[in-house]
Regions:
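Extracellular ligand-binding interfaces
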Residues: 164-168, 178, 186-236, 261
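Catalytic cores of secreted or luminal carbohydrate-active enzymes
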Residues: 55-150
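Short carbohydrate-recognition loop motifs
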Residues: 124-165, 292-304
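Extracellular and analogous surface-interaction loops
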Residues: 144-146, 156-181, 233-239, 304
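Activation corresponds to long, low-complexity, non-globular regions
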Residues: 76-101, 257, 269-303
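Extracellular beta-strand ligand-recognition surfaces/modules
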Residues: 187, 229-268, 280, 304
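Catalytic phosphate/nucleotide-handling subdomain of diverse soluble enzymes
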Residues: 1-71, 75, 190
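Solvent-exposed, conformationally flexible loop/turn segments
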Residues: 136-137, 150, 182, 223-227
Length: 304
């Protein structure tokens, strides 16, 4: 796999069409074991920034994309997908279910502490794990070291992107959120016995990209070794842009000022009907490369 991609890059100097095609062929041929996880999959973190006119689909994670294509393939073949994929496809095809080995669904981790905010450092780690699962066989495990007692740990997903989120956007993506006021966030959380905390609460939250305000749902006390089902029904709202949703964990250790934090999340999804109003005066002009301009939350094609 590695050598084939290297040859494709060096011979053609075209890393999207040529190498994208041969990497697909070689990936199917060799399977996951042929792909170096640390080199290729971990940096990508399951995130695909697409460039279609459908803004909510441009923020795509690889498991969702894989099941989206799989659903179409089985429909064209007139066949029924096997379980557990049929249930996932029929219920919440875009859910963060973590059943694909190594999948992260483009989830991230951050904390309130500025010194720990840089994801990818030795202090913060996420990984797909078969150690615990709410349903199925896998979940997402997060570990944060040196967490100050009483601070928040956020395990989250970006639901909308803007130009400032990119260092290279030459393919001119455009985005609209895939969650709106009126809908409900669902998620499941688990704290293992070995997590170094005396008391932990967990809840769900969302971030308004316009005001910068964070809205929190009700938190629950976590019992180590038990899954907790969480939900947050977002009320009707006006003039907001929900660009981030996730879990918020707060842990206290009475013996240490800082400790190691470990937990799992699973079955993270959105349902319900949007209920919101929007005044275009609150919109922002997004400036992409060249002459490409978009109105925040909206996408268009040749003026439409």
């Amino acid at each position: 796999f590695d050598r084939t991609l290297a040859i494709g890059c060096m011979c053609g100097w075209d890393t999207d069409c040529n190498v994208g095609n041969i990497s697909t062929i070689m990936g199917v041929r060799g399977g996951l074991n042929a792909i170096n996880y640390r080199k290729f999959r971990e940096p990508v973190n399951d995130f695909l920034a697409c460039s279609s006119v459908i803004g909510s689909l441009n923020n795509m994670d690889i498991p969702y994309g894989a099941l989206y294509i799989t659903k179409l393939a089985y429909a064209l073949a007139g066949e029924t997908p096997p379980e557990p994929w049929k249930d996932i496809i029929d219920s919440h095809i875009d859910a963060c279910h973590f059943e694909f080995p190594g999948s992260t669904h483009a989830m991230h981790v951050k904390t309130d502490d500025d010194a720990l905010k840089q994801e990818g450092s030795s202090n913060i780690r996420i990984e797909n794990s078969s150690e615990a699962a709410h349903t199925g066989a896998r979940s997402l495990k997060f570990t944060v070291t040196s967490v100050p007692s009483g601070s928040n740990v956020y395990v989250y997903k970006k639901t909308c992107y803007c130009p400032d989120d990119f260092s290279d956007d030459r393919y001119n993506p455009c985005f609209s959120p895939f969650i709106y006021p009126g809908q409900t966030i669902h998620g499941n959380a688990f704290i293992p016995d070995y997590s170094e905390s005396d008391a932990i609460t967990a809840g769900l939250y969302f971030h308004d990209g316009y005001s910068g305000r964070v809205y929190y749902g009700d938190s629950v006390g976590m019992k180590k070794g038990e899954w907790a089902s969480l939900s947050y029904s977002i009320p009707q709202m006006e003039n907001v842009l929900i660009d981030e949703i996730g879990f918020v964990f707060t842990g206290i250790n009475t013996l240490r000022p800082a400790f190691e934090y470990a937990g799992f999340v699973d079955d993270f999804y959105i349902d319900g009907c949007p209920d919101y109003t929007y005044d275009m005066a609150y919109s922002k002009e997004e400036k992409w490369p060249g002459l490409h301009r978009e109105i925040s939350q909206f996408t268009r094609l040749t003026g439409h």
